[in-house]
Each structure stands twice: as C-alpha cells, then as structure tokens.
From Swiss-Prot:
Gene label: hisA
Biological process annotations from GO: L-histidine biosynthetic process; L-tryptophan biosynthetic process
Molecular function per GO: 1-(5-phosphoribosyl)-5-[(5-phosphoribosylamino)methylideneamino]imidazole-4-carboxamide isomerase activity
Disulfide bonds: none
UniProt cross-references to SUPFAM superfamilies, sorted A to Z: Ribulose-phoshate binding barrel
One GO term describing the cellular component: cytoplasm
Keywords (A to Z) from UniProt: Amino-acid biosynthesis, Cytoplasm, Histidine biosynthesis, Isomerase
Protein name according to UniProt: 1-(5-phosphoribosyl)-5-[(5-phosphoribosylamino)methylideneamino] imidazole-4-carboxamide isomerase
Active site: D10, D131
Catalytic activity: 1-(5-phospho-beta-D-ribosyl)-5-[(5-phospho-beta-D-ribosylamino)methylideneamino]imidazole-4-carboxamide = 5-[(5-phospho-1-deoxy-D-ribulos-1-ylimino)methylamino]-1-(5-phospho-beta-D-ribosyl)imidazole-4-carboxamide
Assigned EC number: 5.3.1.16
Enzyme class: isomerase
Length: 240
C-alpha cells in the first residue's frame, strides 16, 4: 500500500463536524452537506475519502448510512467508512452500496470470531480501527476503555487476516498536537501490516514524518477544516 492522505468527514446529525478527543460535547460544525464536503475533497485531488458515522459509533448501529451511501455512490474515488458497523448486514449494505473499505472497531474487541469471519469474507475491503487511550483500546464511540492493549489486538487481528489498520491516539484527536508516530510504528510492527495514522496531524511536517516512518497513510481532519494547510498542499507533500 502506497502512502495515502485520507481527508476525513465526521458526520453527526447529518452535518460535517469535528470533536475534540472524541468528546461529543466539544463539537464544531464545519458544513451542512457531507456530500458537498466529500466532493470538494475529490475535486482537490484526494485519492480516497474517509467517513465516520459519529452517531452510529454511539448508537452501535449505522445512523447516517443514507448520507454515507450517497457519498460512496456519487464520488469517483473510493470511500472508507467507520462508525457503528456491528453486523454482517451492516457490512453488506455498505459494500454493496459502493463503499470501498469498511472499518470495524469495537466489534473487533468484543466479537473476535465474527471479525475473523468478516475478514475471511471481505479481505481487502475490511480494515480494523484501533482507537487507543494510554495504550489500551477504547470502544463504544470512545466512551469506554477496555483492558486490551492496542498492539495485542493488532497482532491478533493480523493473525485473522487483517491487512489494514487505522490507529487513533484519542488524546491527540482533534487537538492539532501532532500524531503519535511511535505508537503507530509499534502497531505496524506488532501486526506486520499497513497502518494508517489518525489523530493529531497539524502540519505538513507531520505528514512528512508519518511517510518517513513507512506508514501506509494519514487521516487528516481538523487541520484541513481550520486551514492549517490545504488538501492540495498535503497531497503534494504526502503522495509524491
């Protein structure tokens, strides 16, 4: 997997928002139309778009799925989706609806056998999202912290066939404090797989460091919305 920049769209109540450290009480709305935002990313040159159903993550089922399917069907670039995906039916609906890659998060912790089956069925169309707080996996829209270490979960999921992981350091998400490169690299080594870094990217230099660390990509959200840099600048640096 080559290094890829994933502009991020987090959807809550049908709008494009960003949270700080996953806190639903610390929300900023950046747009009324997720599709228009996604289209603007595509027009700027994005090779992928990353979409999260924040309501879904909390409700443990897809909530903004119609908006997400609209994005997947109308864009010409592949779309990666996470948030509230818990059943085979959820996965089927997204994949059959045009989503290129589905991200499983909490379910990987609580239903490893099911996750193994889904990895066997969907292969490269699946990614495992590992969101960590102080090294331990957080679940249920980050409202709970498990007793499972991020690296242990990554190693187990890699044995089950996972090839792509998305690692988020919750303490840095939405804070523009720089990504946790050390943790991303440790996870990549534990799983011997592709790791996409998420959380904390604040500058073009951060993207360059992630690329230099041989990671598979970076998910960029708040830095774009707050105009720390443009997507065109990020793509020029990151995807050479």
């Amino acid at each position: 997997m080559s290094y890829t920049i994933y502009p991020a769209i987090d959807i809550r109540a049908g709008k494009c928002v960003r949270l700080e450290q996953g806190d639903y009480n610390k929300e900023t709305i950046y747009g009324e139309s997720p599709y228009k935002m996604a289209k603007s990313f595509q027009d700027a040159g994005a090779k992928w778009v990353h979409v999260v159903d924040l309501d879904g993550a909390k409700a443990k089922r897809p909530v903004n799925d119609e908006a997400i399917l609209t994005i997947a069907q109308k864009l010409d670039v592949p779309v990666q989706v996470g948030g509230g995906i818990r059943t085979e039916q959820d996965i089927d609906r997204y994949i059959n609806g045009g989503v290129a890659r589905v991200v499983l998060g909490s379910v990987a912790v609580y239903q490893p056998d099911f996750t193994k089956q889904m990895l066997a069925k969907y292969g490269e169309q699946m990614a495992i999202g590992i969101d960590a707080r102080d090294g331990y996996v957080a679940t249920e829209g980050w409202l709970e912290t498990s007793h499972v270490k991020a690296e242990d979960l990554a190693a187990e999921m890699a044995r089950f066939g996972a090839k792509t992981f998305i690692f988020t350091d919750i303490a840095r998400d939405g804070m523009l404090t720089g990504p946790n490169i050390e943790a991303c690299v440790a996870l990549s080594k534990a799983a011997n797989a592709n790791v996409i870094a998420s959380g904390g990217v604040s500058s073009i230099a951060d993207l360059a460091q992630l690329r230099a660390a041989s990671l598979a990509g970076a998910i960029v959200g708040k830095a774009l919305y707050t105009k720390r840099f443009t997507l065109e600048e990020a793509l020029a640096e990151g995807e050479l």
